[in-house]
């Protein structure tokens, strides 16, 4: 996992494969479905859209699409790193059944197969990682969905963030970084941490110990 954390800058700079003639039409209501580490990318996209647009964004982390949601006719984005997450696949099938506008982010699996079969837009990320280890790739992927006139701007922000992160990491050796991380983890392992973040998703994501967080 450590090598993937240190590779975050390169992930943010990675050019990702998209479907032919990839275009995301404008929308006012977006439903994002994704579980676990894949769903975190949906939280990131919701944060960006909430800060920059008036678009209604709902992130769902459960099976299917409830009728009350489908009746709103939202644009749907389904995110599953493997492409085979049961909850997300069921939601795709509900979108097809209700004739909703949808697209996917995945490394393969059933999601990508369904997108190709139904000629829906997709962003494909490289396979072979655990979803949480692919955070940079999934963050880059969701930036394709900001809007048709702003996606290039946010994709470039990801590239710049990756460059900056690589520059910061290059100033210290891997052993120095690991030593700092180990010392910090030992200091907080027996304590209750208090974390302040700019957004809820930044504050609580990946917490594994009893923690108080605030925004």
Ranges and model annotations:
Residues 1-17:
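N-terminal amphipathic/basic leader segments beginning at the initiator methionine
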Residues 13-24, 174-187:
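A short, well-structured juxtamembrane/interface segment
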Residues 190-191, 214:
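Terminal, contiguous helix-loop blocks that mediate binding/assembly
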């Amino acid at each position: 996992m450590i090598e993937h954390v240190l590779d975050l800058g390169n992930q943010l700079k990675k050019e990702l494969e998209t479907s032919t003639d990839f275009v995301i039409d404008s929308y006012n209501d977006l439903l994002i479905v994704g579980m676990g580490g894949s769903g975190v990318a949906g939280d990131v996209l919701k944060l960006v859209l909430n800060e920059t647009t008036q678009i209604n964004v709902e992130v769902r982390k459960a099976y299917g699409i409830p009728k009350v949601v489908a009746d709103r006719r939202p644009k749907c984005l389904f995110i599953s790193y493997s492409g085979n997450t049961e909850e997300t696949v069921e939601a795709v099938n509900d979108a097809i059944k209700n004739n909703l506008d949808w697209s996917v982010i995945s490394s393969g699996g059933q999601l990508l197969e369904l997108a190709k079969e139904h000629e829906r837009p997709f962003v494909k990320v490289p396979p072979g990682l655990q979803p949480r280890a692919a955070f940079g790739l999934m963050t880059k992927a969701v930036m394709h969905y900001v809007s048709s006139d702003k996606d290039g701007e946010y994709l470039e922000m990801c590239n710049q963030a990756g460059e900056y992160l690589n520059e910061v990491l290059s100033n210290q050796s891997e052993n120095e970084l690991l030593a700092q991380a180990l010392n910090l983890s030992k200091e907080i392992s027996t304590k209750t941490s208090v974390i302040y973040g700019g957004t809820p998703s930044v504050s609580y994501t990946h917490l594994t110990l009893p923690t108080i967080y605030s925004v």
